[in-house]
Amino acid sequence: MADQLTEEQIAEFKEAFSLFDKDGDGTITTKELGTVMRSLGQNPTEAELQDMINEVDADGNGTIDFPEFLTMMARKMKDTDSEEEIREAFRVFDKDGNGFISAAELRHVMTNLGEKLTDEEVDEMIREADVDGDGQVNYEEFVNMMTNK
């Protein structure tokens, strides 16, 4: 399944993986997964975290390595019920709930994830997604960005 991913997608997932893999040991533990999810405003229980790991933990060692992470991401991309997931992700970014993601909101979430971006990088991300050129990302633009990769 992961063999249907492009080089670019794999590179992006590698970056995402390293955000989760806080200690850089090449695996994601339930603790690391919990840290990232909480920084995104979610509040998963220990059991939920364990379930999420078990779902993709092919070798059963209790952690997720990069190949397992890739499989999980490939599966998620194929999921058609991702509409709700995308809406949820949009809500995470849209802090004030006004239906738009501003550069400040994007910077805030990325910083919470431990991804320190320069103002230029944040502006570039907004520009890439901002089809109508109003300087912020609305839901439709966000959906396009998430699904057209």
UniProtKB/Swiss-Prot annotation:
Modified residues (N-acetylalanine): A2
Pfam family, one: EF-hand_7
Residues annotated for Ca(2+) 1 binding in this entry: D21, D23, D25, T27, E32
SUPFAM superfamilies, alphabetized: EF-hand (SSF47473)
Residues that bind Ca(2+) 4: D130, D132, D134, Q136, E141
Modification N6,N6,N6-trimethyllysine occurs at: K116
Record-listed Ca(2+) 3 binding positions: D94, D96, N98, E105
GO annotations of cellular component type: cytoplasm
Entry GO MF terms: calcium ion binding; enzyme regulator activity
PROSITE patterns for this protein: EF_HAND_1, EF_HAND_2
The UniProt record lists the keyword GTP-binding: no
Miscellaneous comment in the UniProt entry for this protein: This protein has four functional calcium-binding sites.
Family (UniProt): Belongs to the calmodulin family.
Matching PANTHER family: CALMODULIN LIKE 3, MYOSIN LIGHT CHAIN 1, 3
Protein name: Calmodulin
Protein's organism: Ciona intestinalis
Record lineage: Eukaryota, Metazoa, Chordata, Tunicata, Ascidiacea
